[in-house]
């Protein structure tokens, strides 16, 4: 049995193992990481011998941690990474190569439909009616999408919403409010089995799932880095943010919105920027906290979208997929029963 895990921003760890009487046997740990002293690897391997094959990645990481001595140095690898590689070797955790993906662009829909599809399409994937996928959003009107647990009145300036005809939606994931005008943002949703991030903390899962898009940004000459917990940023400010929701059905949505351009005046008239966030970010201006991609590249939004689409398709051998009329009808129905309802948008307890 063979499993691999590449630590985001780190090194590759490889585990080979057999299982005898439901326990690990003949475990081998290797990779391009660095350990000091050399015998730390022997101790790590020995700690895994005889471990129950049903052990979680967390339990396996604890075994590795216990085998380390004070002063041991691990570079490019963590005990958690070893645990994930073991789980992958046992077939309990998935890698990207284990998943047959679709890649989808669009269609252009009313703002709230995209938010609803981040729930309805997860249900389709879990039921086997659709493959896991990466979907690039398109929408036909200005919107603000607030996080699942945010207060409408604390995040939204109603006068600005009314003035500019903005749709306010509440998504199924947590995180902060996003001001999203057509043509000024790039948003994608990734629907995957939670087994792809089995054993990872949220802090580990975010950069792991967005590693492919960081590669695209680098190719496009956009200097970006991941800032824990869930921000993509340049040295000048935030480019985008990610959010996730994991369902009990074994699937999850991970989505990211990145600023391509920004109407700073309009954003400040629509969103409220709380004093706690101002103090935390160290600036009095929401605008100064955002660094849209257009500031670093002269490429049109459409070219960046195509680069995302092509890179994901090539990297993960994805098939081009579509959103059907039936998918849209299901999403519209979900808007009527949930996402467009006042009690959802204005934070009723029905969704918690």
Label each PLM-derived region with a short phrase.
Residues 1-17:
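Short, charged/polar N-terminal "headpieces" of proteins
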Residues 350-352:
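Conserved small/polar residues in nucleotide/adenosyl-binding loops
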Residues 226-245, 327-336:
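Beta-rich nucleic-acid/ligand-interaction surfaces
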Residues 55-61, 72-79, 133, 221-228, ...:
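Flexible, glycine/charged-enriched surface loops at secondary-structure junctions
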Residues 185-232:
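Contiguous, small/hydrophobic- and glycine-enriched helical/loop subdomains that border
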Residues 87-200:
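N-terminal lobe of the biotin/lipoate ligase/transferase fold
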Residues 12-14, 19-92, 293:
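Active-site- and interface-proximal helix/loop "cap" or "latch" segments in soluble metabolic
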